[in-house]
Amino acid sequence: MYDNALHIRHLGKQDYESVWHAMQHYTDNRDENSQDEIWIVEHTPVFTQGQAGKSEHILNPGDIPVIQVDRGGQVTYHGPGQLVVYPLLDIKRLKIGVRQLVTHIEQSIINMLKRYQIEAYAKADAPGVYVEERKIASLGLRIRKGCSFHGLALNVDMDMSPFQRINPCGYAGMEMIQCKQLGGPQTVEEAGRQLIETLSQELGLDKLVHHQGLPESYE
């Protein structure tokens, strides 16, 4: 039975494909009794190309794999030192629309960074979160059966050079920035703790239940 809580899954470091397939399975098998979950993960290096992605935005992938995925948006990079958060939410049950969900996610990142005196903002025409015109967080969602999957990536303390091999989110010359440069959270763990607080507040869900690892049936 749905327990009106937000279940937080701490996945640690995982390859992209296994987590992607697990969240597809979770979403496909949901019903009205399924829990709302947020998965927190750090991925091994990978470029993911969204449904709107164009191959010309992948400039020089080199030895980093490129995976075509079923989320919105263009190409982005995931790697160690980046916080990735996947909200697996029944937005119909929560009575919020897709645009509202995007706004809640963006605002939760902005509110979290404000705790570190970092002035961040969203853009109406380019999803994500920015600081001084440089992108600190990327966003790409998919809605299926009224439920969300995929999510956000926040640059914390990572090797930023792979972003130079692509046009991030389809924008040539898009500059990326990370928390470490700005005096923000210095570790993925710290960023995850802070962001879960602000995201759960934005969603109006204050009962949190923490778990380690993927659901047993998807491991």
Curated annotation (Swiss-Prot):
Species, as recorded: Shewanella halifaxensis (strain HAW-EB4)
Enzyme Commission (EC) number: 2.3.1.181
Gene: lipB
Pathways involved: Protein modification; protein lipoylation via endogenous pathway; protein N(6)-(lipoyl)lysine from octanoyl-[acyl-carrier-protein]: step 1/2
Lineage top rank: taxon: Bacteria
Residue numbers marked as site, Lowers pKa of active site Cys: 135
UniProt keywords, alphabetically: Acyltransferase, Cytoplasm, Transferase
Ranges in a coiled coil: none
NCBIfam families tied to this protein: lipB (TIGR00214), PRK14342.1 (NF010922)
UniProt-recorded name of the protein: Octanoyltransferase
UniProt keyword Thylakoid present: no
Catalytic activity: octanoyl-[ACP] + L-lysyl-[protein] = N(6)-octanoyl-L-lysyl-[protein] + holo-[ACP] + H(+)
Physiological role: Catalyzes the transfer of endogenously produced octanoic acid from octanoyl-acyl-carrier-protein onto the lipoyl domains of lipoate-dependent enzymes. Lipoyl-ACP can also act as a substrate although octanoyl-ACP is likely to be the physiological substrate.
Further details from the record: In the reaction, the free carboxyl group of octanoic acid is attached via an amide linkage to the epsilon-amino group of a specific lysine residue of lipoyl domains of lipoate-dependent enzymes.
Binding site for substrate: 71-78, 138-140, 151-153
InterPro entries per record: aa-tRNA-synth_II/BPL/LPL, BPL_LPL_catalytic, Octanoyltransferase, Octanoyltransferase_CS
Enzyme class name: transferase
